[in-house]
Swiss-Prot record:
The lineage of its organism: Bacteria, Bacillati, Actinomycetota, Actinomycetes, Mycobacteriales. Part of the twin-arginine translocation (Tat) system that transports large folded proteins containing a characteristic twin-arginine motif in their signal peptide across membranes. TatA could form the protein-conducting channel of the Tat system. Belongs to the TatA/E family. This is Sec-independent protein translocase protein TatA. Keywords: Cell membrane, Membrane, Protein transport, Translocation, Transmembrane, Transmembrane helix, Transport. Residues 46-84 are annotated as: Disordered. It is found in: Cell membrane. The gene is tatA. It comes from Mycolicibacterium gilvum (strain PYR-GCK) (Mycobacterium gilvum (strain PYR-GCK)).
Length: 84
């Protein structure tokens, strides 16, 4: 009940032909096709630019910390002492 049946489509097509004429319909369909192609190519270009921008960013390098256990270090060594 809610969908369009085939005779509904025939009425819609007849109205378009009466309003726009038989000559203008192919031209309109052709220009719509060109517009869709241009739109799709622009979308692909934007996606490739976005992917290229992501790959151009340098990776963040995390610094490594060296943990020194104070219990293993000697508190005094001969090289640390200054002569008087």
């Amino acid at each position: 009940m809610g969908g369009l049946q085939p005779w509904h489509w025939l009425i819609v097509i007849a109205v378009f032909v009466l309003l726009f004429g038989a000559k203008k319909l192919p031209d309109a369909a052709r220009s719509l096709g060109k517009s869709m192609r241009i739109f799709k190519s622009e979308i692909k270009e934007m996606q490739s630019d976005s992917n290229a921008a992501k790959s151009d960013q340098p990776e963040q390098i995390t610094s490594e910390r060296v943990v020194v256990d104070p219990s293993t270090q000697s508190t005094s060594s001969n090289s640390d002492k200054r002569p008087a």
